[in-house]
Each structure stands twice: as C-alpha cells, then as structure tokens.
Amino acid sequence: MMDKFRMIFQFLQSNQESFMNGICGIMALASAQMYSAFDFNCPCLPGYNAAYSAGILLAPPLVLFLLGLVMNNNVSMLAEEWKRPLGRRAKDPAVLRYMFCSMAQRALIAPVVWVAVTLLDGKCFLCAFCTAVPVSALGNGSLAPGLPAPELARLLARVPCPEIYDGDWLLAREVAVRYLRCISQALGWSFVLLTTLLAFVVRSVRPCFTQAAFLKSKYWSHYIDIERKLFDETCTEHAKAFAKVCIQQFFEAMNHDLELGHTHGTLATAPASAAAPTTPDGAEEEREKLRGITDQGTMNRLLTSWHKCKPPLRLGQEEPPLMGNGWAGGGPRPPRKEVATYFSKV
C-alpha cells in the first residue's frame, strides 16, 4: 500500500500541471457539494432579502477564489518576482501577467461552479427578487393598487417562505416561485455558456493572435519557476553539507579534547589537523558541495545578493564581479554539478 502511495506521489510531483488541475477539479466538486449541504434560509423581510442573497451569491465565491490562490505555490513566486529589486535583471510585465492569469484561471473554477449552481437552483434569486414580481400580470391586479407599498412589499417578501406566506388572495405563491426560478435558470445557463466561451477564447484563440508574445511569456515564466526550484535545492544541499561538516568538526574536536584532558572551553583552540575527517573522499565531496561558502556571514551575503541582484540572463559571457553583497570566496568559483529534471507547474 505504501509503495502505491509513493508511486502516486512521485507521479504528482513530476506532473505538477496535472496535479493543479486535479486540485481545481476537486475544489469545484467540493463547492457544488457545499452548496447542496448548505441550509438556505431566506429572512423573508423586505429590507434583508436582497442583502442576504447577495452575500450567498458573492461571499463564498470570493473565499473559494482566495483558497485557490493560496493552494497554488506559485503565488509566493509571483509576489517575489514582482517585488524584487531590479538589480541586473529586468522585470517583464508580460511574464508577470502570464503567471497571474495562469493562477487565476485555475482559481476561478470553483467560484464559477458555485455561481452556476446557485443560479440553476433558483433559491437565491427567488429570495432576492421576490418583491419585484409583477403582481398585475401574474396575480390579482385589481387588488394591488389598493395596497400601500410597504404592505405589498411585506407580502411579496414572504413568497420564499411557504409557512408564513399569507398573500394567496393577491398572488399564488407557486406562480411567483415558478416565474422567478425560470428566470434564474435562464441566467444560470447563460452564465455557463458565457464562461465556457470565454475559457475557449482565452485558452485556444488568444495564442493564435499573439503566438510570439505568448511563447515568450510562457518560456520565461517556466524559467522563473525552475530557477527557484534549483536555487532551493542548491541551498538545501549546501545546508546539509554545512551541517555535516560542522558536526564532524565538533565531534572530532571534542574527541581531541577528551584525549588531552582539556575542558569544554578549549574547543575553539583545537588544531586544524584534529578537525580533518577520517574519510578524506567523503570530506572532499562535502567540501565540494559547500562551493567555497564556509561561514555564516558569507552565506548571508550570498542570499542577500541573490535577492537584490540576480545574475543577468546571459550565458557564455564573463560576468563582472559582484561588489558588496556578491561573491566572497577567494579565487575562481568551484565547478557546479547540477543535473536535474523539473516540470513547471505554472
């Protein structure tokens, strides 16, 4: 069983786009299930029906949209790219727009499903517009002019509540309910049709007219995603090597002090030969992973430099040395060994 879960997890990791599409589909199904389980209670009061219905129609989609953005890991990447200092790498607004649109398209699926299900069900629309039913056309129009406007609004506001509705002498409740639900379902199917056409235009037609710009934005958004993953992986590898070498030096220095009978305070004066690891090949490999960054201050300057002044997107050319918060290691940079395969989830 664990092997199956491991295989599924590895598949999802290697297919980030399919994984995000699956998450969006699950959220869409969850939004429909949430609406079916939701207990809709119209207040049946003239001043509150519209506000209650608007809250039911708009608030849950907003929450679902924000949840869709939160569950997308690219939100932090987009914010980081948007707010980073310019440095030696220009920021392309087209790439930022592409990244945001890619996330927004997936995050909008669940809100669209909620709005469509709400309109097709008709309860929310019935509660919101029950006071706008044309009594003269659907009910006893001869009695309507004799009623004061507040009294007429009070009677019509109770149409969604069959247990308290007392205006059958003016307008049959079933007639008003069927009339409003018919309009609501027509709006619901129109909304589904419009969103489907809009999605078709965005996904299929737009790249045909702006193919070059679309390909550029897509490529560089994927590059930003992969660059961030590689940097995080390199930092993780460096942190592991740094911790391993630091712990080895501590244990070997402690062993040296115990052999000499020194106290705890002499750890800092242990000879450098005592800190040499017992396995030279393994130690050399760990030293190579450190890439010349062997102290906390240098690492902090490197991270600050990466944030403030990312390297230009120019390969095969000699880069000018970074000043201040740049490369602090002596001599040339050690060779890098980076062999990895990533699938972008943008």
Swiss-Prot record:
Keywords: Calcium, Calcium channel, Calcium transport, Cell membrane, Disulfide bond, Endoplasmic reticulum, Glycoprotein, Ion channel, Ion transport, Lipoprotein, Membrane, Palmitate, Sensory transduction, Taste, Transmembrane, Transmembrane helix, Transport. Changing residue 67 to W: Decreases channel expression at the plasma membrane. Residues 1-21, 73-99, 207-346 are cytoplasmic. Residues 10-37 are annotated as: Central pore. N-glycosylated. Assembly with CALHM3 is associated with N-glycan remodeling and formation of hybrid complex- and high mannose-type glycochains. This N-glycan processing regulates channel trafficking and gating kinetics. One of its GO terms (molecular function) is monoatomic cation channel activity. It is found in: Cell membrane; Endoplasmic reticulum membrane; Basolateral cell membrane. Glycans are attached at residue 140. The chain crosses the membrane at residues 22-37, 50-72, 100-125, 181-206. Predominantly expressed in adult brain. Detected also in retinoic acid-differentiated SH-SY5Y cells. Specifically expressed in circumvallate taste bud cells. Residues 38-49, 126-180 are extracellular. The keyword Glycoprotein applies. A lipid is attached at residues 101, 208 (S-palmitoyl cysteine). Disulfide bonds join 42-127, 44-161. GO terms for biological process: ATP export; ATP transport; monoatomic cation transport; protein heterooligomerization; protein homooligomerization; regulation of monoatomic ion transmembrane transport; sensory perception of bitter taste; sensory perception of sweet taste. Changing residue 140 to A: Prevents glycosylation and impairs ability to activate the ERK1 and ERK2 cascade. It catalyses: ATP(in) = ATP(out); Ca(2+)(in) = Ca(2+)(out); Mg(2+)(in) = Mg(2+)(out); Na(+)(in) = Na(+)(out). Regulated by membrane voltage and extracellular Ca(2+). Inhibited by Gd(3+), ruthenium red, and Zn(2+) and partially inhibited by 2-aminoethoxydiphenyl borate. It comes from the Eukaryota. It is a multi-pass membrane protein. Pore-forming subunit of gustatory voltage-gated ion channels required for sensory perception of sweet, bitter and umami tastes. With CALHM3 forms a fast-activating voltage-gated ATP-release channel in type II taste bud cells, ATP acting as a neurotransmitter to activate afferent neural gustatory pathways. Acts both as a voltage-gated and calcium-activated ion channel: mediates neuronal excitability in response to membrane depolarization and low extracellular Ca(2+) concentration. Belongs to the CALHM family. A phospholipid-binding pocket is formed between conserved regions of S3 and S4 helices of one subunit and S2 of the adjacent subunit. It may regulate channel assembly and gating. This is Calcium homeostasis modulator protein 1. It comes from Homo sapiens (Human). The lineage of its organism: Eukaryota, Metazoa, Chordata, Craniata, Vertebrata. The gene is CALHM1.
